[in-house]
Amino acid sequence: VVYCNARTTCPSRTTCCRSPFGVWYCCPFLMGQCCRDGRHCCRHGYRCDSTSTLCLR
């Protein structure tokens, strides 16, 4: 289990991400990169594009 804060958890081998509105969500990748839109994320070693919909290396 990954602890995002005192009340929110994500499954093991995932990453906690926080949306711009303060809502936590789980990225399905270990050490994932959270995108600014608060909905998407990328694998470790990749980054989100400006639209937060594509992952770039």
Curated annotation (Swiss-Prot):
Keyword Ion transport found: no
InterPro entries hit by this protein: Granulin, Granulin_fam, Granulin_sf
Keywords from the named record: Cytokine, Disulfide bond, Secreted
Domain of life assignment: Eukaryota
GO molecular function, one term: cytokine activity
PTM characteristics: Granulins are disulfide bridged.
Chain ranges passing through the membrane: none
Disulfide bonds: 4-16, 10-26
Cellular compartments per GO CC: extracellular space
Keyword Metal-binding: no
Tissue specificity statement from the Swiss-Prot or TrEMBL entry: Ubiquitous.
Cellular localization per UniProt: Secreted
PANTHER family per record: GRANULIN, PROGRANULIN
Functional note: Granulins have possible cytokine-like activity. They may play a role in inflammation, wound repair, and tissue remodeling.
Family: Belongs to the granulin family.
Entry protein name: Granulin-2
